[in-house]
Amino acid sequence: LKCKKLVPLFSKTCPAGKNLCYKMFMVAAPHVPVKRGCIDVCPKSSLLVKYVCCNTDRCN
């Protein structure tokens, strides 16, 4: 997950109200993203699932 300050053409901007980018992946397979997108609050990681969040709504 790369957090962006500037907006390149291929970056995604989140809708209003969900202004954090996040990526979710399994701890057992850290290089295989399970889900990514926009969220309002960064979820807590668990023993099985890890979340990586940006503090911005622009990411790729």
Curated annotation (Swiss-Prot):
Keywords: Cardiotoxin, Cytolysis, Disulfide bond, Membrane, Secreted, Target cell membrane, Target membrane, Toxin. GO terms for cellular component: extracellular region; membrane; other organism cell membrane. It holds the Pfam family Toxin_cobra-type. Its main location: secreted. GO terms for molecular function: toxin activity. Disulfide bonds join 3-21, 14-38, 42-53, 54-59. The keyword Cell inner membrane does not apply. CDD domains: TFP_snake_toxin. One of its GO terms (biological process) is killing of cells of another organism. Expressed by the venom gland. The keyword tRNA-binding does not apply. It is found in: Secreted; Target cell membrane. Shows cytolytic activity on many different cells by forming pore in lipid membranes. In vivo, increases heart rate or kills the animal by cardiac arrest. In addition, it binds to heparin with high affinity, interacts with Kv channel-interacting protein 1 (KCNIP1) in a calcium-independent manner, and binds to integrin alpha-V/beta-3 (ITGAV/ITGB3) with moderate affinity. Belongs to the three-finger toxin family. Short-chain subfamily. Type IA cytotoxin sub-subfamily. Monomer in solution; Homodimer and oligomer in the presence of negatively charged lipids forming a pore with a size ranging between 20 and 30 Angstroms. This is Cytotoxin Vc-5. It comes from Naja oxiana.
